[in-house]
Amino acid sequence: MTDLVVTGRGSAPVADLISSLTRDVADFPKPGIQFKDLTPLFADREAMAAVIDALADIAAGTDLVAGIESRGSLVAAALAARLGTGVLSIRKSGKLPPPVLTEEYDREYGAASMEIPADSLELRGRSVMIIDDVLATGGTLGAATRLLERTGARVTGAAVVVELTALRGREAIAPLRVHSLSRA
């Protein structure tokens, strides 16, 4: 994977590009949380292309890209189009018709659950790379891994745009192999 990208802004490491286009929002969605708003990054054509290029190097050779709703699914769809693979959106509970497989987990700011279709996909034996926007506590990636493994999928790893290292999410989901494009 090349770490240096050339954009209209000149040459810069992918991590620097991500950092420059990430907006920190204090006390959102609740007091004490420092939210990473990646909207400016995703809206920038060159930056989004650089992110997808970097992720394509990481996810090459996988059968399926699984994105965690909502921003992880946005990135996963673009990545799957680039790789020529399928994409699966791991949805928040209540967004899919039954039957579904559900996995509960804890987030940095509360408990939640996620779902995938229970009977309309054949994932057994397929290699899957999980994509999300931010790795915080590891709750979301851990739940997505458990959910996919219940189907018989072979989770080859996860990739995130930003990793919040102080929250030690990587340690919480070990031994899952995690690739982060930038760390904060």
Curated annotation (Swiss-Prot):
One term under GO cellular component: cytoplasm
Record keyword Glycosyltransferase present: yes
Assigned EC number: 2.4.2.7
Signal peptide (residue range): none
Main location: cytoplasm
Alphabetized GO MF terms: adenine binding; adenine phosphoribosyltransferase activity; AMP binding
InterPro entries: Ade_phspho_trans, PRibTrfase_dom, PRTase-like, UPRTase/APRTase
Annotated localization: Cytoplasm
Reactions it catalyzes: AMP + diphosphate = 5-phospho-alpha-D-ribose 1-diphosphate + adenine
One Pfam family this sequence matches: Pribosyltran
Role noted for this protein: Catalyzes a salvage reaction resulting in the formation of AMP, that is energically less costly than de novo synthesis.
Name recorded for this polypeptide: Adenine phosphoribosyltransferase
Species in which this protein is naturally found: Mycobacterium ulcerans (strain Agy99)
